[in-house]
Regions:
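Short, Lys/Arg- and Gly-enriched loop/turn segments at beta-strand edges
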Residues: 135-143
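His/Asp/Glu-enriched, well-ordered alpha-helical/loop segment
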Residues: 1-11, 18, 23-35, 40-122, ...
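Short beta->alpha junction loops/turns
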Residues: 11-12, 136
Length: 153
């Protein structure tokens, strides 16, 4: 039972019941929340092309997920980190500290970089997302990389 799992917790790829079951069985130390997002994430005006511009795949983004144009299957995720956090808090019994760990320290442990990422501590990289919560919705307020504030887009 030492294996870890990666979940696209966007509210589309996996149902709430499965997210809750995996949380109960594995716990936050064995779950990494991943966006697995395509280049269509955050775009507002179609068309959306994933892959290369020349030979890429056109996709349709509806209700927070990318589909093939004929809607025969998902074509990837368009979820962002704030959405994963919101989804886990809304659809599962996860606490805020548990959900944040699944987005930070657990992935860092899986990647073997938990000696410098995944925590806020002296001597660590200081890559930080500052979230806010309004009316139950999580939003990204500020982003720091190496302790430096990134300009807003």
């Amino acid at each position: 039972d030492d294996f870890r799992v990666e979940l696209i917790a966007d509210g589309c790829h996996l149902p709430a019941e499965l997210l809750s079951l995996v949380l109960k069985v594995k716990g936050e130390r064995k779950i990494a929340l991943i966006t697995d997002c395509t280049s269509a994430a955050g775009l507002t005006a179609p068309p959306y092309i994933i892959g290369s511009r020349k030979n890429g795949q056109t996709v349709v983004v509806e209700q927070g997920v990318a589909f093939l144009p004929d809607h025969s299957s998902f074509a990837g995720s368009v979820a962002t980190t704030d959405r994963l956090l919101s989804t886990m808090l809304a659809l599962t019994p996860a606490t805020l500290p548990q959900a944040v760990r699944m987005l930070t320290l657990t992935p860092a442990e899986i990647l073997g970089i938990a000696d410098r990422k995944g925590r806020i501590a002296e001597g660590w990289d200081a890559d930080i997302l500052l979230f806010d919560r309004e009316e139950g919705k999580i939003g990204i307020k500020e982003v720091y990389i190496g302790g430096k504030l990134l300009p807003k887009l």
